[in-house]
Amino acid sequence: MINEIGQQWRGKKWYCYGTSMTDNSVRPGRNAGQLFDGQKSSPDRTGFYSQYLAEYAGLEEHNFGKGGKGIVPALHKEDSIKSRVMTLADGKAEADLITVEVIPNDAKAELGEITDWSDDTFCGNLNQILAYLLENTQAFVAVLIATRSRYNPGKRHHPAGEITQKRLRWEDAVEKICRMHGVPCWNGAAEANLGFFRVGLEQKYVYDQIHLTEEGGRVLAKYFWGKLQTVYPLR
């Protein structure tokens, strides 16, 4: 049961951008990930955290998440998260809250340096996205990290494994860029208690070693809701 101590976001317009972790209309493909032993099928959608965060906070949700997409245009053609964010055609000028969920689906890109503004690197595109939102809207802007991308029982995904260590380097870069721009980074992958030893070995919170189950989405939403209660709309 969510304790509704924070009412400041009730009725406010939330524009959310991101991957399949955010997109609550996605029907995962058969090759989205590997089911755990005993699982016969995948849920018909993902992005559960966005549904529950909107419910907990009383937000008017405008969901522009897109499964399989990232912020680096070279990897995602014309319809990238960046192209969805860097336009006012969707009405975001009236948004009270804008969140951009990042990292999944950009792993093949070059990370780059945190001071980079290039179209070719992850850091460069994140810098451009944040500058655009701060210059063109009066919304409260936050960057979200929802997952470490794959919760696999193999040793590469162990907390000390090479995959996790790579993700940590990317998360560190995101957090530093957010500090540079004066916006928060809410890192659910690091802080929502959905780590390897809780979710990597069974199916309660993650159903295909990638996407959160509905229960996992609720846990992540509660984490983000806790963060949201500590800040207020700018207008």
Regions found by a protein language model. Give the residues of each.
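Residues at the starts of beta-strands that form the adenosine-phosphate
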Residues: 13, 60, 139-141
